[in-house]
Amino acid sequence: MPGAMQPLQDWPASERAGIVGVLTDIDDTLTTEGAITRDALQALEALAGAGLHVIPITGRPVGWSEAFALQWPVDAIVAENGAVALTRDAQGRLRKLYQQDAAERATNFARMQQVAQRVVREVPGATISRDSGGRETDIAIDHSEFTHLPQDAVDRVVAVMRSEGMNATVSSIHVNGWYGSHDKLAGARWAVRTLLARDLDAELERWAYVGDSTNDVLMFQHFPHSIGVANIRRFEQQLAFKPRYVTEGERGEGFVQVAQAILAARHSRAGGNPRH
């Protein structure tokens, strides 16, 4: 939303009670200092136990996301900014679904490695993210995970990627670039349709999105129930669209507060099937 962010407690209980699914960023939204806390994991379990759908959507790579897709109580993880969905089959084995076919992925992969090398050559201090070995459909430049790039260097990385015809977004830790029409919103629509047989746009009022950075702006713009964890304020002046609500807690603590707000409203509502 373009206006000021409202405190989470201003989210009407009647709206919270109707939520059937939560889409969330991972780094610095669900996790804290690079790991999921016990409280955040319990919040995921509580949401799932109440019958809500939960789908984390991240710029992190497939390789990084695989273990969490198997371990966390979520419907799926959508990795690499909407390109790949990781879920479990009936036997609990990892299943990967792609938006692009194998030939297109191979062609794009080769092009992206060339762009990554150009970024490293042309932007002082730029380094390829340490998790890049697990990436299949994008590239990532570290700006805040294991190194620090000043804002002008981050802007230059984005400019180089876009000059090569790539999409480029900035998360709380990386600059991600990729070829293709997918993004977090397209990935959310695709995953909900493919895995849950639901039309996300037809029931937007029943879904919430939680995020923390400029990489979430498209989701903040699209979802009426959008929430930023408190550390979103780091990026507040750069947000073309702000989340409607903001938590008091940062990172995983903020996510826990969102889960508690939804569950409290649902528990106070008499009867009803959450997956109608």
Residues covered by each model-derived region:
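Short, hinge-like loop/turn segments at secondary-structure boundaries
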Residues: 72-75, 94-98, 146-147, 187, ...
